[in-house]
Amino acid sequence: YPQMPHVFYMPDIPYRTFYPNEYLPWMKSLEEATDILQQELQTLLAQNAKRFTPYVHSGLDRTVSDEGDLLDNESWTSAYLWQNGAPDTDVMACCPETVKLMESLPLTKINGLAPSVLFSKLSAGATIAPHTGMLNARLICHLPLMVPPECGLRVGQDERQVKRGESWAFDDSINHEAWNRSDEERIILLFDVWRPELNEEERHLITTLLESVRSYRSAT
């Protein structure tokens, strides 16, 4: 399972399926906030559940690799605090502490592309088919908030069981899939951050390149 991003490939980035948490010192504060983040999620579910829509949908302005069963799939839905860099103030209003915590993290910031910060809901008995993400210059982070038994994630050849309050980061340019084999919903907080190996200059160059490509495509 090589790195196979479908938008941008950064050479010479180490191959890691799951990134060691010890290199991401903010993970500890993220896990410590599990209770308050779950409370805000429950507020969102009670007050604005309609914000959950299919994670991959027909009107999405991006290329999705191996989209197959992912497209317009009601069993995998999401409610965004930020989607492709754009804030959703209705969702944010339910989740002020989540917003505050996210703003303290090294989120990937690329105009029109990132960050994306969302609550990701996987229905009972559902699976997310194998797929790859856009960039290998970022990591996708999960904080499980409402997790029944029998939920898991595979990245490359590595599998992990999803457990409430146990966060991780992984390279989503590597083929990955998820499942919920229980009879309850699974909801996690999902967001993207820069890989720690990249310095500020490299991040700026990647940002400038991808913003320029997006601007060109929008004009043609």
What are these regions (language model features)?
Residues S116, R138-C141:
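Short glycine-rich loop/turn motifs
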Residues Y1-L118, L122-T132, P148-C151, N199-T220:
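Fe(II)/2-oxoglutarate oxygenase catalytic core
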Residues L145-R164:
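A short beta-strand-loop-beta hairpin characteristic of the jelly-roll/cupin
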Residues Q161-N175:
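Conserved metal-binding segment of the jelly-roll/cupin
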Residues L135:
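Glycine-rich phosphate/pyrophosphate-binding beta-alpha loops
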Residues I140-P144, A169, E184-N199:
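A short hydrophobic beta-strand segment most commonly corresponding to one strand
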Residues I128-H131, G152-L153, F170, H176-S182:
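Short beta-strand His + acidic residue motifs that chelate non-heme Fe in jelly-roll/DSBH
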Residues E150, N175-E177, W194-L198:
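Short Gly/Pro-enriched loop/turn and capping motifs at secondary-structure junctions
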